[in-house]
């Protein structure tokens, strides 16, 4: 039995072509006249390489004319030669959906990686789907409470919205995504789908182990197309994961969280594919279809009536340049941005969120309420004033400031440290259990802090803790009491003592101590 005959039995189609050209992951296939497959159709080729037989999946990307189609391979093309039979499946790439995908790892083609053969009999959906119609969308705006102080207070997330974690390499984007998976599963019992797009294989394995240890793997489906995969796979893996999430939203009426790490790699893979297809590059070498490809993905991530897909996307910023077309194009689709800063990271404050650079469309009294909005704006005002004073402190020293500004600086430093929090994803490294702080307690704590009720407490007492109970416990362990001070204004003498004129690092001397706390 020939390979073409076997494929006919598997796919139910007799539309068979042959390979005429192979250039890396780009494969040109010739079909009989009048039988050219449609764009995005999946094609199968049976090949043998070094005594290993495998089925290669190709996706039709271009019609070249004269019954020729140009395809992108989803796997390495080692062993593929001219003349090999290629069968049109008559449909696009599809992936398994349903409750059975939870607790398992899949690739972009829907093959189970942790249990080969698993899921073959599942219902399958095409990865190329239309977004919900306008009249199906949920008009209501609702906040998603995470239990992370800095997020809930200053950059509240939208249920059913799109949230981005911006940052350069090594500032904690993946750790924060792992933290959110833990929190959603433990605190809300929600379904999560994770898309590993072009990131390190080691990180995928670590995530698998951590989710299993935290007993949340049973509520999570993982789809990986890591950085060693061909660009076609890296470009499609986000769509495969999104399709699984859409099933839970549309068929099971569930709220779903979709995590994408890293959306920049999706753009990068699209750029590689565009170059391979011979398209003229656009700005900074990116593909001319960048905005279109991003829109096709992002428009499917939305809330329909009564259920939602909330997406959290890590965005690598090349060379920390936010004007780069990849992160700039992503901005247009977002409801909230959480920027992870290298300067905050260097102070040992985790999560390393820059509260002044991060934003949310729902930080508005009509959504979060007057009290939340007032406290958030006061915290931002104090931190912004502290930032404005940095140059003066660096040149003249803190002693040259007015008394009111000295007090504000000390208060801002306490706010900075109180925005840090011990995280569940870091328990094995810190030895401290992760903390979840209710929104009401977060607002109350920062309201008191911004009014000066805690000015008498040492800065280190605010570092990497949860709520007010943790603050009281840590302050008492350092010999201070919560009710010893008030808002009378005088900053603790130890904070400004010996900070002389011209000391360029006067306001950051506590940072090293924080790291050791």
From Swiss-Prot:
Compositional bias segments (type: Basic and acidic residues): 475-484, 495-508
Chemical reaction(s) catalysed: ATP + H2O + 4 H(+)(in) = ADP + phosphate + 5 H(+)(out)
Binding-site list for ATP: 167-174
Organism domain of life: Bacteria
Lipid bilayer topology: Peripheral membrane protein
E.C. numbers: 7.1.2.2
GO MF, one annotated term: ATP binding
Location in the cell: Cell membrane
Family matches, as InterPro entries: AAA+_ATPase (IPR003593), ATP-synt_VA_C (IPR055190), ATP_synth_F1_bsu (IPR005722), ATPase_a/bsu_AS (IPR020003), ATPase_alpha/beta_chains (IPR050053), ATPase_F1/V1/A1_a/bsu_N (IPR004100), ATPase_F1/V1/A1_a/bsu_N_sf (IPR036121), ATPase_F1/V1/A1_a/bsu_nucl-bd (IPR000194)
Pfam families (alphabetical): ATP-synt_ab, ATP-synt_ab_N, ATP-synt_VA_C
Swiss-Prot/TrEMBL keywords: ATP synthesis, ATP-binding, Cell membrane, CF(1), Hydrogen ion transport, Ion transport, Membrane, Nucleotide-binding, Translocase, Transport
Enzyme class: translocase
Entry's Gene Ontology cellular component terms: plasma membrane; proton-transporting ATP synthase complex
Region feature (Disordered): 475-517
Physiological role: Produces ATP from ADP in the presence of a proton gradient across the membrane. The catalytic sites are hosted primarily by the beta subunits.
Family: Belongs to the ATPase alpha/beta chains family.
Subunit architecture: F-type ATPases have 2 components, CF(1) - the catalytic core - and CF(0) - the membrane proton channel. CF(1) has five subunits: alpha(3), beta(3), gamma(1), delta(1), epsilon(1). CF(0) has three main subunits: a(1), b(2) and c(9-12). The alpha and beta chains form an alternating ring which encloses part of the gamma chain. CF(1) is attached to CF(0) by a central stalk formed by the gamma and epsilon chains, while a peripheral stalk is formed by the delta and b chains.
NCBIfam families: atpD
HAMAP family, per the entry: ATP_synth_beta_bact (MF_01347)
Name of the protein in question: ATP synthase subunit beta
Lineage: Bacteria, Bacillati, Actinomycetota, Actinomycetes, Mycobacteriales
